[in-house]
Amino acid sequence: MPLLSVSTSIEINKKNLFLKNCSQLVSKLTNKSEQYVMVRLFDQTPTYFNMDQSPSCFIDFKSIGSLNPSEMSKEISIFISNQIGIPINRIYICFE
């Protein structure tokens, strides 16, 4: 079961839509049915990253099977930036 945990310092106003869009992205990236995908969101989480508290996002991506961080990082970063406006250089992704 793929799990995407998103922790961000900003408030996400349309949480349900964001969660749905994340679930669809994870399904696409892992080639697994969306019925097995779990997405967790932690917004308004105080975060200190790169020596300041500017808007940022931490992504923890877990899945049994193959994850390809070098290919997935760019797509996830662009997705997050487009969805919630976090600059790509303020997104940190951990793959397990």
State the predicted function of each range.
Residues 1-96:
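Interaction-mediating elements
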